UniProtKB/Swiss-Prot annotation:
Reported function: Inhibits all the catalytic activities of DNA gyrase by preventing its interaction with DNA. Acts by binding directly to the C-terminal domain of GyrB, which probably disrupts DNA binding by the gyrase.
Record's protein name: DNA gyrase inhibitor YacG
Cofactor: how and how many bound: Binds 1 zinc ion.
Protein family: Belongs to the DNA gyrase inhibitor YacG family.
GO MF annotations in UniProt: DNA topoisomerase type II (double strand cut, ATP-hydrolyzing) inhibitor activity; zinc ion binding
Species of the source: Rhizobium johnstonii (strain DSM 114642 / LMG 32736 / 3841)
Cofactor: Zn(2+)
Length: 70
């Protein structure tokens, strides 16, 4: 019976651990996909300061509306 409890207590991860996108260390479940709160906050800071941006082509910025509205 004790062996059954031990086998049931083992938890299998749903996905393989991936490296942290900031520093390359193995990711932590609590801070996924980062390894620590420090790396998570560093990434958030880059988003908030505009360091990350989605490039937009010039012709995409001038949207043409069928009704002539802007």
């Amino acid at each position: 019976m004790p062996e059954d409890k031990k086998a049931a207590a083992k938890v299998e991860p749903l996905r393989k651990t991936r490296p942290c996108p900031e520093c390359g260390k193995p990711s932590n479940r609590e801070h996924y996909p980062f390894c620590s709160n420090r790396c998570r906050e560093a990434d958030l800071s880059r988003w908030l300061t505009g360091a990350y941006a989605i490039p937009v082509a010039d012709d995409e910025t001038k949207a043409e509306y069928p009704d002539g509205e802007n």
